[in-house]
């Protein structure tokens, strides 16, 4: 095997151990898994030792894309800055009105005729993360003694936000069935609803499993939310990145049919679907006026005024393109008519807009094809080493249970894999809030992100499997912390 893995020297491990126990663990006395993992992966002394031992860093599960953004979006951003548009102004606390108008037009296409969004239903935020923290701050202010239920495993920031705002967060996870694995615990969520429940959080598509909620699932949750006056937060960050978009059901489509729009808030962002993570463009939207007005006040108090407003031209162009994709290219004239109130779209000719949609379509088809190939490649390489895997639904992430690691300390394996191969991994405890639940009975779970470099992604998975064999044969040659989470 090319660049065959070698177990580092005792001297190397001794130096790393000193840094780990005398510096990193002392600074992370609470031993929160994600903080500790990041402290190790980013420690300059450890990285220097790895470089000296010819160990190169690689990632297969970071959740950050290596793919480039659509060129049309980059051109729009550059053009707007050259024309001194948007960046010179302060905007309302909900964000630039042109951007919110464009978002309302786009999102309205999914609803029935009895209800529609207005620009006031939208708030631009600092990425989807900013939207999440504002919603939590709203709960803290208006419902401080209420409980939050969350689909688990899930994005770690929800736990961080709940801790920061001193809110009661209860994770809800189903039992794992190897023959029909699912991390979508709809019935379990409903069983755990009490009189103190105020917020239910679901991620659709799910992170990290990539599963998609069915129409039946969404109806169950929204009906009981309406009955008990509960707010449902649906994180749709990955909604555009599905392999079969015709089968994806939008939560507000269901809520509008159930007259439950007041019980729904949706969070979206441009980090994953547009490969624009560094721009921090996000937004939330809801027909719940108490929520949106509270978020506007929070934004005003933070004096953030959303940096996303600086990219209004990009947001407007994307809303137009996604609207055409949703309605089909044959209805582009209707969409152009609807968007005539949006300056960014109005100033473009019909032929420019048609060309933009065609160019984006080619870009997006290529992107999804790339993700699909990485998914198939990963499952093929893992082969029998993947004891449990999820169906191919969402294009960005999945998570697999790795065979033969049930009785291995998750943290120690992750740590030594990084120190030996340079491979950064995100594993089960990264997504489990009650981390004791990720015990030996559940096993070792590895998230895979398909948006990584093709060559490095393949090499990373191969090296992971090779390291597993070496580690299981020689456990005493590696660092042992015996930490559990």
Residue spans for each PLM region:
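Conserved core of the PLP fold type I
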Residues: 86-224, 239-261, 265
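Helix C-cap/helix->beta junction micro-motif
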Residues: 165, 227-228, 421, 471
